[in-house]
């Protein structure tokens, strides 16, 4: 009954963006919030950092550098996703191609929006993030709650509810449907 792609183990290319306090307006500027679907926001992710005034790629922005092209794991600083509670920020990062975001901390609402959009937010200490950023690819094992480079593994914490949803590929609707018979029974009792 999976409604989203389950995350069990994931190996991907990383891109470091070690700024602290990256807010949702920096992730997806409000000028781009005119869409009514979840898709199509990727080209606008980090818009003000990603592009030069003439619209060309900013060569100094890490995700634009050739060695980071195709990265699906973002390693970033503390307090990622702070600011307004727009879910568009998670949509933009997912549409950009990120599956996992590793930060020192997250805004609570942004963290929840990631999990609701099949992205895994992971909290790790700065030394662990700096170590992982030295590698081209790293591996995440959600059932065992580890992030590994070729030479070292780091444990991370995640609420069992979020972990269950992501490991089993369950969105809110799929979870509700698990209780369909109880819901029907209750409705008949009214």
From Swiss-Prot:
Gene Ontology molecular functions: 3-isopropylmalate dehydratase activity
InterPro entries noted in UniProt: 3-IsopropMal_deHydase_ssu (IPR004431), Aconitase/3IPM_dehydase_swvl (IPR015928), AconitaseA/IPMdHydase_ssu_swvl (IPR000573), IPMI_Swivel (IPR033940), LeuD (IPR050075)
The protein's annotated pathway: Amino-acid biosynthesis; L-leucine biosynthesis; L-leucine from 3-methyl-2-oxobutanoate: step 2/4
Function: Catalyzes the isomerization between 2-isopropylmalate and 3-isopropylmalate, via the formation of 2-isopropylmaleate.
Enzyme class: lyase
Highest taxon, organism lineage: Bacteria
Catalytic activity: (2R,3S)-3-isopropylmalate = (2S)-2-isopropylmalate
Subunit (UniProt): Heterodimer of LeuC and LeuD.
Protein name: 3-isopropylmalate dehydratase small subunit
Organism: Staphylococcus aureus (strain bovine RF122 / ET3-1)
The enzyme's E.C. designation: 4.2.1.33
Claim: Amino-acid biosynthesis is one of the keywords in the record: yes
GO BP term (any one): L-leucine biosynthetic process
Protein family (similarity comment): Belongs to the LeuD family. LeuD type 1 subfamily.
Keyword Membrane applies: no
GO cellular component annotations of the record: 3-isopropylmalate dehydratase complex
Keyword set, alphabetical order: Amino-acid biosynthesis, Branched-chain amino acid biosynthesis, Leucine biosynthesis, Lyase
